Amino acid sequence: MKTAHWADFYAEKIKKEKGPKNIYTVASGITPSGTVHIGNFREVISVDLVARALKDSGSQVRFIYSWDNYDVFRKVPKNMPEQELLTTYLRQAITRVPDTRGYKTSYARANEIEFEKYLPIVGINPEFIDQSKKYTNSTYASQIKFALNHKKELAEALNEYRTSKLEENWYPISIFCTKCNRDTTTVNNYDNHYSVKYSCECGNQESLDIRTTWAIKLPWRIDWPMRWKYEKVDFEPAGKDHHSSGGSFDTSKNIVKIFQGSPPVTFQYDFISIKGRGGKISSSLGDVISLKDVLEIYTPEVTRFLFAATKPNTEFSISFDLDVIKIYEDYDRFERIYYGVEDIKEEKKRSFKRIYELSQPYMPSKRIPYQIGFRHLSVICQIFENNINKILNYLKNVQDDQKDKLINKIKCVINWIKDFAPEDFKFLLRSKFDNIEILKEDNKKAISELLDSLKKNFEVATEQDIQNEIYKISRENNIEPALFFKQIYKILIDKEKGPKLAGFIKIIGIDRFEKIVSKYI
């Protein structure tokens, strides 16, 4: 039977290729050399979705996330303060670089904490592994010794995909100088036991004991497969750059065999682009969009939905423009289908319901959450000037267990209007009348008639009733309906167009409508 979701397909593939196990290990990781961006998040959530699928099939899962923070600091990101100071730390381990923003003890840790803080919000709770601690505590001493003792085999595996072969005096390690802390070093000798001699460009020369030193690490293309073996990794995806022909994954799947392990099940995930960014995000973070930024516009459920509803090898854009409205509409439809409020063909229903399940940070609620369209909610938010209590008071039949998610959605709507909505989407209900336009008598008469008509049965009138009345009165007064609509918008929000007028008036309420239009008649 065809699986309901791509995550279920890979869960089955893992169990088939790795065989029955008490626990399956799935892995992800990143070098925290800058703000951990939403492209990095695609790997994390891809692993989480497969982990969920494994758990749903009855398997135990260990989800590890490696902070590759013992990598070299190669380049100063443009969005970091004190560029000159940071430049002095180039070629040192990232964990030694100070946090020039003043948040944490190190630059790397500041980037890590920012990401760790927001992962639980979207239901992701991996076991974090600090690779700098692993190396500085000599945890990998036996693996480093193994690599040195198998230098020839490792060189052959690396040379298979290199245009220029490694030199005879190459060693499968890199060393941070204990004097200047940089990796500007050359390995001079290994005694085939535990002693390694090196020299540094700064002039320092010394011998190190593999069992006790903090200064030796394996280079990336050896470190990665070594950890597959060490952590017993069964699944780890990678980006298209790693999966390119002759890329790091091709090399690593051969090197892991030298370490007497096997490569994990994998897949290639594609890149993410950003559509409609600007304003706050652009000015504060340059070209970097973080999970925090996305969660300001998308609820945790919709954030997960963006990835759960898209195959990992598909490139897609995260939108901050008007497409946000469509994305929320799509999610709401999946929600209605999941709870049986809306029906579709049976062959699609299973897939839709599974996507909705995997979009939830934790368990789906027992009943359907309070549904209100993003566009409609954006009108309500602006009418009530983003006052959440007033918005909740206006909305009917919101149950206590529905409030938290609804409030979160309201906050996302408010953020989107403030930072990304086009200007013609924004409005402010008129509250000052010191510079109002004087209406012609026939327009005054029509507006007065509309007010009187609406006051008679406003509570029971539908949006269609109000719409019909606007057209009726415009025709009776020989006013072109389009011009009459413009006049009403101008009175209410000082613009010639705005939200759908009948619904807009219904939300405003007859008292506020009368208070505004009475100033003109």
Swiss-Prot record:
CDD domains assigned to the protein according to its UniProt record, in alphabetical order: LysRS_core_class_I (cd00674)
Motif ('HIGH' region): 32-40
GO biological process terms held by the UniProt record: lysyl-tRNA aminoacylation
Locations listed in the record: Cytoplasm
Disulfide pairings: none
Motif ('KMSKS' region): 280-284
EC numbers on record: 6.1.1.6
Keywords, alphabetical: Aminoacyl-tRNA synthetase, ATP-binding, Cytoplasm, Ligase, Nucleotide-binding, Protein biosynthesis
Residue spans crossing the bilayer: none
An annotated GO cellular component: cytoplasm
PANTHER family: LYSINE--TRNA LIGASE
NCBIfam families cross-referenced by the UniProt entry: lysS_arch
The name this protein goes by in its record: Lysine--tRNA ligase
